[in-house]
Structure formats: structure tokens, C-alpha cells
Amino acid sequence: MDGEVKSYWFKTFSHKSFSVIWDLFYNTSNGVTKKTINSGTILNHLNEVGLAYWVMGDGSLHREGRVLTLHTQGFSHDENKMMSEELNLKFGFKSKVVKHKNKFVVQFTTSDANKLHDLIKPYLIPTMQYKLPRKL
């Protein structure tokens, strides 16, 4: 190469209509903004497509291929517990909160493999199919 550096960039924009989404995941108190999740967010807003996107972004499949973890370490234990409970209530899972490197994550058990597979498979892009739990 001749020392020329190629780069690409893009610009995003902000709009007041995104404030509704911001309010679901951030709380400002005493001038400090913290990531959070409000009760009912999963029950009222998450569907199968959203769950598939969540798995593609933050999911990891264990070696045996039947246990899936959502890496939710950015949330507190109580927030993880609430998310797990709402996922279980909304979709009929048996997920649980487990400790992972001194933080907490939501984990789907092997008993959820078939249901999780069937729910998200239609929405996973081909390069993310490796995150799909194997059916029992």
C-alpha cells in the first residue's frame, strides 16, 4: 500500500421519538444516568423477533448445544431475576439467574431448548444460526 488509509463513517441522529425506548432502559437520578430495566418491559414489549435479536446480540450457546446464556451482566441481580421471571411468564420458559464471573446472567435450561429453538429460528440470520439451541 502507498500509506493511504481507507475509512468509512456514518452519522446517526437523535430524535425525540426514541425517548420512549431510552426510558425503558435508562434512569437518571441526581445527574447520574444508569442502565436499568423496568418491570413489565419484557412482558409488554418483547416478542419472538426481539428475543431472537437479543440472542443474536448477547446470547451464547454452551458446548453441549442445549443451554443458552443471555449475557446480561450489565444489570443487577434483581434486574436479572425480574427479566428471567418475565421471560418465563411470557414464553413459558424455565430460565434462571446464575452467577458468571462475579456478575449475573440469565440462563435457559436444557428443558427450554426445543421451545427456544422453535421460537427464534425463523428470525435468526444465517450467520447466527450457531447460537440456536439443538433440539432434544
Curated annotation (Swiss-Prot):
Subcellular location: Mitochondrion
E.C. code: 3.1.-.-
Entry-linked InterPro entries: Homing_endonucl, LAGLIDADG_dom
Principal subcellular localisation of the protein: mitochondrion
GO molecular function: endonuclease activity
Family membership: Belongs to the LAGLIDADG endonuclease family.
Name this protein carries in UniProt: Probable intron-encoded DNA endonuclease 3
